[in-house]
Regions:
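Electrostatic, structured charged patches in enzyme active sites and in nucleic-acid/phosphate-binding
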Residues: 1-116
Length: 116
């Protein structure tokens, strides 16, 4: 999840499965965009998909990846560093994101960086 007001470094690039410029804000998000690009079951994806009517915020948050599979199903992915999982705000936002998407009948998945 990303707050649209955050002022962090953004890497921009073009990938064939994303119609817009792919903007990634950390290593986990960058690496997972490559995974989605190579995944044969993913038809297309949107990076930093805006959340409307999202609880806890004023609508300024995005889901990291909103994906459409070849079967037409929607799957969303949130990317997070392992060290941030224990932070109360991160846990609260991830839980809210999961509930937001599950209420809409969308499969929700979490992507975590490798353990070192």
């Amino acid at each position: 999840m990303r707050n649209t007001n955050s002022k962090v470094r953004c890497e921009k690039r073009q990938l064939s499965k994303c119609k817009e410029v792919v903007k990634t804000y950390n290593e986990v998000q960058h690496a997972f965009a490559d995974v989605l690009e190579k995944d044969a079951s993913i038809r297309e994806f949107i990076c930093n998909y805006p959340l409307s009517d999202f609880p806890l915020t004023d609508g300024k948050y995005t889901t990291d990846f909103y994906c459409t599979t070849n079967e037409g199903d929607i799957v969303v992915y949130e990317c997070v560093f392992r060290r941030h999982l224990t932070k109360p705000l991160t846990a609260k936002l991830l839980d809210a994101s999961r509930n937001y998407w599950l209420r809409r009948g969308v499969e929700w998945r979490l992507v975590i960086d490798e353990e070192k």
